[in-house]
Regions:
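Segments forming oxygen-rich coordination pockets for charged ligands
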Residues: 1-111, 118-120, 142, 187-189, ...
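Short glycine/serine/threonine-rich phosphate/pyrophosphate-binding segments
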Residues: 92-95, 155-160, 180-183, 265
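ADP-ribose/adenylate-binding Rossmann-like module
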Residues: 107-109, 146-153, 162-187
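Short, glycine/polar-rich helix-capping loops at beta-to-alpha or helix-loop-helix junctions
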Residues: 113-118, 156-159
Length: 336
């Protein structure tokens, strides 16, 4: 189950899962792709997910979710964000530089060969020359992708937007005056794209911080990207936990499914204890982590344990500011 999740995460950069936490189907888990639920257990429980697809597909946060009388833990995994800059002009250079500083894999594409050189973009991971009509052929689809359209005209803008809106993405922004943006929108509406699709485009691009210099515009653009990137609560991948999964370790996966107060790790944080007692990852250290490690060998199948950090209980568990943490224990007899 987790190996499949991490495999698809490596390919797409983003995965959404949901687990049932109560009732007769407790422990059943699915992956949500293209608004459809795909069972990660067996085909016998595939049908039950159809009743929940709409609500699960709409959920954008890692969190607990009630649908009717059924409780779910929805988890959004993200990894390796890609910044794809379409247009190699003067604004693109500082955008690429800042994007690299922020931890993005950076791609720059332009239809002019002399505009996409290593001298102009020393921080880029990938440089592509070609027509903007070739985006689908030259740039693989990737869900955790942030597209910045900064071409020199509305024809280039519409060529880029036309292809990007037919693929998954996390962010799509387009530079230009309001008139240029209006022309592009009208052209795309005439081609059959809907207002709903076009409203996903950040245009004009960037936060309204003022400034006309290329570097100032780049700060505006990347600030909006960071804002969008941090808009939802997601689960960031612990490399040690992923390594244990890939090595098919048997043991217990522990995940924070809810928290309040001052607990140091957020919802979705994971750690894994293998059968030999070796720990991978962390859910925040201290006595909470110690108590979870102590309980893990006794866990049976799918189990939730609540650690009360309020008042004296919090002091005993190393969280004197109070709060509460719920930890999900999943017994992994053979990681698959």
């Amino acid at each position: 189950m987790y190996r499949k999740i991490y495999q698809i995460l490596e390919e797409t950069g983003k995965v959404k899962t949901a687990m049932i936490l109560n009732g007769i189907h407790k422990g059943a888990k699915c992956m949500i792709r293209e608004n459809q639920c795909i069972s990660l257990n067996d085909s016998e429980v595939q049908e039950l997910w159809k009743d929940y697809e709409k609500e699960l597909a709409a959920c954008q946060d890692t969190k607990l979710l009630w649908i009717g009388e059924t409780e779910f833990f929805v988890e959004i995994y993200v990894k390796n964000p890609q910044l794809i800059i379409l247009g190699g002009g003067h604004v693109s250079q500082p955008v690429a530089k800042i994007g690299k500083m922020l931890g993005f894999h950076v791609t720059v594409m332009d239809d002019r060969e002399d505009f996409v050189t290593a001298e102009r973009f020393p921080d880029a991971d990938r440089l592509i020359t070609g027509s903007y009509d070739e985006i689908s052929e030259k740039i693989p689809a990737y869900e955790n992708a942030y597209y910045v359209i900064v071409t020199r005209g509305h024809l280039g803008d519409s060529a880029c937007a036309r292809q990007i809106m037919r693929r998954p993405y996390t962010y799509l922004g387009m530079i230009g005056s309001r008139n240029k943006v209006k022309l592009t929108r009208e052209k795309l509406l005439g081609e059959g794209f809907t207002e709903e699709q076009l409203n996903t485009i950040h245009a004009p691009i960037g936060l309204p911080i003022g400034g006309n210099m290329p570097a100032e515009i780049a700060v505006s653009i990347t600030a909006e990207i960071v804002q969008e990137k941090n808009r939802y609560s997601v689960s960031y991948i612990d490399e040690a936990v992923e390594r244990a999964v890939r090595e098919k370790k048997e043991g217990v996966m522990m995940t924070i499914i809810s928290k309040s107060g001052s607990s140091p790790r957020g919802t979705g944080s994971k750690m894994f204890l293998d059968k030999k007692g070796k720990l991978y990852g962390s859910i925040g250290g201290g006595n909470v982590e110690f108590q979870a490690m102590k309980h893990a060998p006794e866990a049976t199948d799918t189990e939730i344990v609540k650690y009360n950090l309020s008042n004296a209980g919090g002091a005993n568990l190393g969280m004197i500011c109070g709060g509460q943490v719920e930890v999900l224990f999943e017994v992994m007899k053979e990681l698959s």
